[in-house]
């Protein structure tokens, strides 16, 4: 936190998730409700990195909940994607943008190139993804392929986090390529989140609850949490008590 900003502690969201342990959760909330901040918080808490990220949580509520919850900190490889800037008028531009996003995320896991758990075929897949040298079919398998390699390398299945999952879909609806983008996203999400033994948990956030039949078809393990649900409601936006407290601080 900075002296120029207020930080509202939402880390008890992590405790609720660990207690409930849903496999895949979709959070839908309006704009400016803290979706991206919460997805980043989940990433920072769970992700296994060279940096000691526990320092960001030592003075937060989750840390006072005990060792059971601390043991989850920094223990998982994480695949993190955000589609918030995928705002284009054509499918071709949208595909290129999604391909670049997946390429950059793949590059963040360069340890796979030298992993003893990955063979030459895995390394070729990695290089193709990292360089963007893939067609639609291969790109739609990116989450499945990357999670498979990470699982074998670390011996722990990764967590997949996708922020603003619905931005490309909204653009498709407005610009006449809805069916194309929905078909692609369905294959991408299914490969990464449906019956995938190489994923521990999945988190998605967005504004819209796109019909489950259209994009999450067959994803029986999906739990949808919307603005109408009481559970997790205190972790998005500000509660009345938080608003009053910040006003007093001001």
Predicted regions and their residues:
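Conserved P-loop NTPase mechanochemical-coupling segment
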Residues: 80, 86-140, 168-175
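Structural recognition of the conserved hydrophobic beta-strand(s) that form the central parallel beta-sheet
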Residues: 159-163, 187, 200-207
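Short regulatory helix/loop adjacent to the ATP-binding pocket of P-loop NTPases
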Residues: 197-199, 210-228
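Walker A/P-loop nucleotide-binding motif
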Residues: 23-41
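P-loop NTPase motor core
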Residues: 9, 15, 44-111, 237
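Substrate-engagement module of ASCE P-loop NTPases
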Residues: 106, 142-152, 180-200
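Conserved small/polar residues in nucleotide/adenosyl-binding loops
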Residues: 245-250
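Conserved P-loop NTPase "ATPase switch" module shared by AAA+ and STAND
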Residues: 154-178
